[in-house]
Structures are given as structure tokens and as C-alpha cells.
């Protein structure tokens, strides 16, 4: 196994504006996503509230798994912190309902597994 590459999120908002908060793995505090990049806060995960994102960093993916979620059957991959292997949420691979297709390729991060750091 080689060296672990950790991606750090920018310290300032786009255009050098005010600094934005960063969501980090609660266990090891490695960056996972910018709070400004949350697409929706209206999701529920295994541990309560969850957020939808287009892009997250410092994760590894588990195998495809079919799951019945609140909105129907989806194929998902669990996402793990690349540093400590804590499960952080999942990525939608396939949605079987036409109304849920917008989720494909997007990520869910569970609020209970995140630490919010204001920058």
C-alpha cells in the first residue's frame, strides 16, 4: 500500500470571499465536503439527518448494493473516510424510479458522522 493522499478543501469561498465551513470526518477530522456545496438538507440516513452533495473528497467506495430506501429501490455504494475507514454515507449509483434519477452519481453524508469546522 502506498502513501495516503489527502485533499484539503480551499480555505476561502469562490473569488476570495468569506471563508466557508468545511464538513470533516467526525472520527479523524479529515476534510470531506464544503458546507457551501450542500445540494439538499432534506435527506435521512441510518443515523438521522443527512445531506446531498455533488462532490466529496477523501473517501473510498464500497461495492454496489441494492437497498430499499424511503424513496424506493436504489443501487448504492457505501462511502468510507479514506483515512480512518469510518462509514460516512453512500453514493447513489442507480435509481429505479424516474423521479429519483437526479440522485445518480451524488453523495449522501450523514450529519452524525460529520464535524463542522468554521473557517
Swiss-Prot record:
<dbReference type="InterPro" id="IPR004910">
    <property type="entry name" value="Yippee/Mis18/Cereblon"/>
</dbReference>
<dbReference type="InterPro" id="IPR034751">
    <property type="entry name" value="Yippee"/>
</dbReference>
<keyword id="KW-0479">Metal-binding</keyword>
<feature type="binding site">
    <location>
        <position position="28"/>
    </location>
    <ligand>
        <name>Zn(2+)</name>
    </ligand>
</feature>
<dbReference type="InterPro" id="IPR039058">
    <property type="entry name" value="Yippee_fam"/>
</dbReference>
<feature type="domain" description="Yippee">
    <location>
        <begin position="21"/>
        <end position="118"/>
    </location>
</feature>
<feature type="binding site">
    <location>
        <position position="81"/>
    </location>
    <ligand>
        <name>Zn(2+)</name>
    </ligand>
</feature>
<feature type="binding site">
    <location>
        <position position="25"/>
    </location>
    <ligand>
        <name>Zn(2+)</name>
    </ligand>
</feature>
<protein>
    <recommendedName>
        <fullName>Putative yippee-like protein Os10g0369500</fullName>
    </recommendedName>
</protein>
<dbReference type="GO" id="GO:0046872">
    <property type="term" value="F:metal ion binding"/>
</dbReference>
<comment type="similarity">
    <text>Belongs to the yippee family.</text>
</comment>
<keyword id="KW-0862">Zinc</keyword>
<dbReference type="Pfam" id="PF03226">
    <property type="entry name" value="Yippee-Mis18"/>
</dbReference>
<feature type="binding site">
    <location>
        <position position="84"/>
    </location>
    <ligand>
        <name>Zn(2+)</name>
    </ligand>
</feature>
Amino acid at each position: 500500500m502506498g502513501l495516503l493522499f489527502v485533499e484539503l478543501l480551499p480555505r476561502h469561498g469562490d473569488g476570495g470571499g468569506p471563508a466557508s465551513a468545511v464538513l470533516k470526518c467526525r472520527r479523524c477530522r479529515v476534510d470531506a465536503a464544503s458546507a457551501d456545496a450542500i445540494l439538499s438538507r432534506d435527506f435521512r440516513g441510518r443515523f438521522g439527518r443527512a445531506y446531498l452533495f455533488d462532490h466529496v473528497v477523501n473517501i473510498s467506495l464500497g461495492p454496489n448494493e441494492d437497498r430499499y430506501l424511503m424513496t424506493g429501490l436504489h443501487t448504492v455504494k457505501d462511502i468510507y473516510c479514506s483515512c480512518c475507514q469510518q462509514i460516512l454515507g453512500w453514493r447513489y449509483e442507480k435509481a429505479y424510479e424516474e423521479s429519483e434519477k437526479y440522485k445518480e452519481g451524488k453523495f449522501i453524508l450523514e450529519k452524525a458522522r460529520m464535524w463542522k469546522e468554521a473557517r
